[in-house]
A protein has these predicted regions:
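Residues immediately C-terminal to the Walker A/P-loop in P-loop NTPase nucleotide-binding domains
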Residues: 154-155
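Conserved lysine of the Walker
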Residues: 144
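N-terminal anchoring/assembly modules that precede and organize ATP-driven motor systems
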Residues: 1-44
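Short glycine-enriched loops at secondary-structure junctions
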Residues: 25, 167-168
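Hydrophobic anchor at the beta1->P-loop junction of P-loop NTPases
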Residues: 136
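Walker A (P-loop) phosphate-binding loop of P-loop NTPases
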Residues: 140-141
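P-loop NTP-binding catalytic core
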Residues: 38-44, 49-50, 54-133, 158-161, ...
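Hydrophobic positions on the alpha1 helix immediately C-terminal to the Walker A/P-loop
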Residues: 147-151
Length: 177
C-alpha cells in the first residue's frame, strides 16, 4: 500500500481541482474532479479511508478526534518542487462516518492556461482596458479563478490589484491580499 504522500502525488499528477473522500457501507470512495467531471479514482477499505482522512486533518491542523462537526483547514504539499495549497473541508453524517473534500490550488505559473480560445482571450483583454465589472460564471474547474488572476497579473506593476477573495485561492506577491 503506498504512503499517504505517494497517494497524494499520484492524484496530483492527474491535475484534479478536487479530491472527494466519501464513505460507503464497507469502503471509502476516492474520486477526483477533473475539468468539472467527478471521476472515480480508487476504492479503499474503511480503515484506510479513516486513516487517510486523519492524516490529512492532522496536516491541516484540524481536530483529528472530531468526526461529526464540520471543519475547515489548509496545508501546503510539495510535489515536483512546487508548493500546492490544499484546502480541506470535512463533515460527518448521523452515523459518524466522515467525508472530506480537498481543493487543490496549484501555483499560477504551473497552471495550464487553456480555458479560452484565442478570440475569447482577446475580447477579455479589450474589456480589461475599460472600467466596469466583468462577471465570470461556469462550473467548478472551468478556469474562472485562473482566468481572473491571469488578467489581474497583466495590470502589474502599473496598477494596484486588491483581491477580495476569501479564502484566497491563488496568491501573488504583487497583489494586496
Amino acid at each position: 500500500m503506498p504512503s499517504f504522500e505517494e497517494e497524494l502525488a499520484r492524484m496530483i499528477r492527474k491535475q484534479p481541482s478536487d479530491l472527494y473522500i466519501l464513505p460507503h457501507d464497507r469502503y471509502y470512495q476516492l474520486s477526483l474532479a477533473i475539468k468539472g467531471t467527478l471521476l472515480p479514482f480508487k476504492q479503499v477499505t474503511r480503515d484506510y479511508g479513516q486513516r487517510f482522512i486523519s492524516y490529512l486533518k492532522y496536516c491541516a491542523n484540524m481536530a483529528v478526534s472530531e468526526h461529526r462537526r464540520p471543519q475547515l483547514g489548509a496545508f501546503k504539499f510539495t510535489y515536483a518542487h512546487q508548493k500546492i495549497n490544499l484546502r480541506l473541508s470535512s463533515v460527518g453524517d448521523y452515523q459518524g462516518r466522515e467525508s472530506l473534500v480537498i481543493r487543490f490550488i496549484y501555483p499560477l505559473n504551473d497552471i495550464r492556461f487553456n480555458f479560452l480560445v484565442p478570440h475569447q482571450w482577446e475580447r477579455l483583454q479589450q474589456y480589461r482596458q475599460q472600467r466596469g465589472l466583468i462577471l465570470f460564471a461556469g462550473p467548478m474547474g472551468a478556469g474562472k479563478t485562473t482566468t481572473m488572476y491571469q488578467l489581474a497579473r497583466q495590470l502589474l506593476p502599473k496598477q494596484i490589484v486588491l483581491t477580495i477573495e476569501d479564502p484566497v485561492e491563488i496568491g501573488h506577491p504583487g497583489f494586496i491580499l
